Amino acid sequence: MRCPKCDHNGTRVLDSRPVQDHYSIRRRRECEKCGYRFTTFETVEQTPLIIVKKDGNREEFSREKVLRGIIRACEKRPVTLEQLEGVVTKVEQQLRALAQSEIPSEQVGELVMNELARVDEVAYVRFASVYRQFKDITVFFKELEDLMKQENSTN
């Protein structure tokens, strides 16, 4: 690692510790020549996740886009931003665990709904109503019934 101050190629690591996401390491370094101390981050290189939309178009997975949709579903609900970011992180981890370069958008939506149901049932129903494009009230009621059956079977 080159020193950013004197460009010397020799540095030593003073301290290493994982960053909160556990995919990065923070290192404190010191230049062997000038003694300048600086911080570096080592991060796992992630291959991009490509989402195949319903119309066949492809786009890179966007945490921000998923988070915006979840935030909309959780308006005026007692859910923290930290919880919502946790949902997005879990969804992204599940997508990466699939080890597929291309993933259908339907699969992303299902994963989001599964995680959201664990956080807030009302937000889940809101998200599902937009995602699944309920055409009438009977489909909406069926989704509620399924959710209630699922809840009763876990209790």
UniProtKB/Swiss-Prot annotation:
Instruction: Output the InterPro entries linked to this UniProt entry.
Output: ATP-cone_dom, NrdR-like_N, RNR_NrdR-like
Q: How is the cofactor bound?
A: Binds 1 zinc ion.
Gene Ontology BP, a term: negative regulation of DNA-templated transcription
Q: Does the keyword Acetylation apply?
A: no
The record places its unnamed zinc fingers at 3-34
Q: Name one GO molecular function term.
A: ATP binding
For activity, the cofactor(s) needed are: Zn(2+)
**Signal sequence range:** none
Tagged with keyword Nucleotide-binding: yes
A Pfam cross-reference name: ATP-cone
Q: Which UniProt keywords apply?
A: ATP-binding, DNA-binding, Metal-binding, Nucleotide-binding, Repressor, Transcription, Transcription regulation, Zinc, Zinc-finger
Instruction: Give start and end of each ATP-cone domain.
Output: 49-139
Function, in words: Negatively regulates transcription of bacterial ribonucleotide reductase nrd genes and operons by binding to NrdR-boxes.
Q: Show the HAMAP family listed in the entry.
A: NrdR
User: Which family is this sequence assigned to?
Assistant: Belongs to the NrdR family.
By its UniProt entry, which PANTHER family does this protein fall under?
TRANSCRIPTIONAL REPRESSOR NRDR
Tell me the protein's name.
Transcriptional repressor NrdR
Q: Which gene encodes it?
A: nrdR
